[in-house]
Amino acid sequence: MTGNKIDQATPTEMMAGMAKKARLASQILAQAPTAQKAEALVLTADAIRRHSADILAANAQDVATAENNQSSSAMVDRLRLTEARLENMASALEVIAHLEDPVGQIIDKRTRPNGLELTRIRVPIGVIGIIYESRPNVTIDAAALTLMSGNAAILRGGSEAIHSNKALYQTMREGLAKAGLPEEAIQLVPTTDRALVGAMLTASGLIDLVIPRGGKSLVARVQQDARVPVLAHLDGINHSYVHKEADPEKVEKVVVNAKMRRTGICGATESLLIDRGYPVEKVKSLLQALHNAGCEIRGTAEIQKIDPEAKAVSEEDWGTEYLDAVLSVRFVDDMDDALSHIARYSSGHTDAILTENREVAEKFLASVDSAIVMWNASTQFADGGEFGLGAEIGIATGRIHARGPVALEGLTSYKWQVRGTGQIRPVA
């Protein structure tokens, strides 16, 4: 292979070869003891720490290229690795290694009147293809979660993170080899050739599931072109609604965190809805706190009247995942008005209410049809790690199979085991 070209195999042939190796590895992983899978993750964590200088050097190449290409500050932040972020990756691996293994768990058990014993147990999905963009940490998170859930994975990261992904991938191979597991259990597409994405999406019968992690255009392409099942992680067009009975002290603290803690993650609040019954002076204080934190406010004419710094909001803004220090703001008449706005514009990821009225909060929690609905908490808690699931492979916003943070359990299916003593089914 030279540069970004595939010299000896077509993209379809290359992907088929990787998938066949992954299938063989998945059969071994499906039977691997929990301790062996956990050992591979702990050894990978150790490798990340030992090779941190090499990983950061590789990442510096990607960051320099992104900056030379005048990529957005949000994109560069998602791409950039630091010693602290590497340590977080290593620590996450150790957390996942100690999570309960879902493989083999009994979901349901029953005995039929004829004596048949039926058991429904969790099993790995098989071979999972993961397509993602600028975040290098997905290489480790995705590999760890697929491995611990007994699946083999084929990773196709974004071209902007190619050097970072290759460096991180080597630590995973080292962990697998030292633990005595097949290195083909986790494979990284080694080229930036976009044709490999198409080959993955059409590898029906070879790849069991594709998970896209990235922006709207990536997810849309995957959903349109895929000939294999897709578990989609869509935009995080998240709302925080300040009810008229909200505690102003909580509001300011939570809303600033929900927007500004890390603006480039999918759990960041993108739209702020404020009840008209909430005190105007507290609204001014909240907006000023956001400005002080470096946030650009885009508001309706009413918002601009009380906040001269605010820019005019457009219709397009309400449906935009900024992933940046920008927030759309408007007043709503009451909770029903807030619910109507959320139903129209939310991507079904995470929406939150701030109020001291439990009855109102419970109605909001029951009414909003999003994967995650919160009360008096920052939307930035929309994360598998914060849910106690370890790392996550994404936030699924669909309604079939997994929903919300997808961790180990979300990467399994199930099968029925039937134990008999010679029963036959009577002729009807």
UniProtKB/Swiss-Prot annotation:
Catalyzed chemical reaction(s): L-glutamate 5-semialdehyde + phosphate + NADP(+) = L-glutamyl 5-phosphate + NADPH + H(+)
Coiled-coil regions listed in the entry: none
Pfam families in the cross-refs: Aldedh (PF00171)
GO MF annotation terms: glutamate-5-semialdehyde dehydrogenase activity; NADP binding
InterPro entries xref list: Ald_DH/histidinol_DH, Ald_DH_C, Ald_DH_N, Aldehyde_DH_dom, G-glutamylP_reductase_CS, Glu-5-SA_DH, GPR_dom
Keyword set includes Nucleotide-binding: no
GO CC terms of this entry: cytoplasm
Compartment(s) of residence: Cytoplasm
Keywords, comma-separated and alphabetical: Amino-acid biosynthesis, Cytoplasm, NADP, Oxidoreductase, Proline biosynthesis
This protein's record includes keyword NADP: yes
Major place of residence: cytoplasm
This protein's pathway: Amino-acid biosynthesis; L-proline biosynthesis; L-glutamate 5-semialdehyde from L-glutamate: step 2/2
Example GO biological process: L-proline biosynthetic process
EC number, UniProt record: 1.2.1.41
Function, in words: Catalyzes the NADPH-dependent reduction of L-glutamate 5-phosphate into L-glutamate 5-semialdehyde and phosphate. The product spontaneously undergoes cyclization to form 1-pyrroline-5-carboxylate.
HAMAP family found in the cross-reference section: ProA
Family: Belongs to the gamma-glutamyl phosphate reductase family.
Protein name: Gamma-glutamyl phosphate reductase
Source organism per UniProt: Zymomonas mobilis subsp. mobilis (strain ATCC 31821 / ZM4 / CP4)
